[in-house]
Amino acid sequence: EKKYFSGAPEHLKSVRREFPQIPILRKDFLLDPYQVLEARAWGASAVLAIVACLQPAQLIGLLSSARKGFLDVLVEVHNAKELETALESGAKIIGVNNRNLKDFSVDIRTSFEIARLLEKEQGYCLIAESGLSERNQLLELQDAGFQGFLIGSHFMNNQNPGELLAKLVAG
């Protein structure tokens, strides 16, 4: 998505050519199953579905299209109501966005609140998104049940993102 994420189809294609084995997420505002097919054609292995931007039927359609195209779907939620919609739609990979889409404030307690709602559930992969910049945050979230992290602007706003990643991972 060009306007909000500064992305373009060529970015996905070039990353796929350079790194044929790594998972690649199309981070975009997907509204139509056709966009899932585009993602597959461009080299993505997963797509983002933001519950706040979709009707339940749209989410189900995106999930169905992704399954047919052998793509994973990172279903993004911001609160308990959106989590319920995601689960009812059959989502298995749940991304908890700590950024409030209305005022862009960030609160990582959102991730912990959603994790508590899922603590008795099994078969879900939890990914924490936004506002993550410290190793101790990642360790605490991992202890709460998160299996992955989507960290974007923290790396993109740094001159040496690789070095920053090494510090984040190694401590």
Predicted segments with their positions:
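Glycine-enriched alpha-helix->loop->beta-strand junction motifs that scaffold or abut catalytic
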Residues: 18-22, 41-47, 67-71, 88-95, ...
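C-terminal helical cap(s) of enzyme catalytic domains, especially alpha/beta-barrels
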Residues: 108-117, 142, 157-171
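Catalytic alpha/beta core domains of metabolic enzymes, predominantly
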Residues: 111, 115-129, 133-134, 152
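Active-site beta-loop-alpha junctions enriched in small/polar residues
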Residues: 1-3, 29, 52, 78-80, ...
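Glycine-rich phosphate-binding active-site loops on the catalytic face of alpha/beta enzymes
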Residues: 38-58, 95-104, 146-165
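Catalytic cores of alpha/beta
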Residues: 31-43, 78-89, 128, 132-151
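N-terminal active-site wall of soluble small-molecule enzyme domains
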Residues: 1-74, 82, 111-114
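Glycine/Thr-rich beta-alpha phosphate-binding loop at enzyme active sites
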Residues: 1-7, 87-116
